[in-house]
């Protein structure tokens, strides 16, 4: 999701998105640890998405 789209969401929606992404990251990390993850680029994408959501939350907290 693009940062501009994230900025239009409310804080509650962003927190829900963050929880969802953290759960997805956990599942991907477990798959990678057991050798089941074929598309390793997903880890990078999820990590980047988490950073984007956290950045937007910090911006909203400063407003």
UniProtKB/Swiss-Prot annotation:
Keywords: Ribonucleoprotein, Ribosomal protein. InterPro entries: Ribosomal_protein_uL29 (IPR050063), Ribosomal_uL29 (IPR001854), Ribosomal_uL29_CS (IPR018254), Ribosomal_uL29_sf (IPR036049). Pfam families: Ribosomal_L29 (PF00831). GO terms for cellular component: cytosolic large ribosomal subunit. One of its GO terms (molecular function) is structural constituent of ribosome. One of its GO terms (biological process) is translation. Belongs to the universal ribosomal protein uL29 family. This is Large ribosomal subunit protein uL29. It comes from Pasteurella multocida (strain Pm70).
């Amino acid at each position: 999701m693009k940062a501009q789209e994230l900025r239009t969401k409310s804080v509650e929606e962003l927190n829900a998105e963050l929880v969802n992404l953290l759960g997805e990251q956990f599942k991907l990390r477990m798959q990678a640890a057991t050798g089941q993850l074929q598309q390793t680029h997903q880890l990078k994408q999820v990590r980047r998405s988490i950073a984007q959501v956290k950045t937007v939350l910090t911006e909203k907290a400063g407003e």
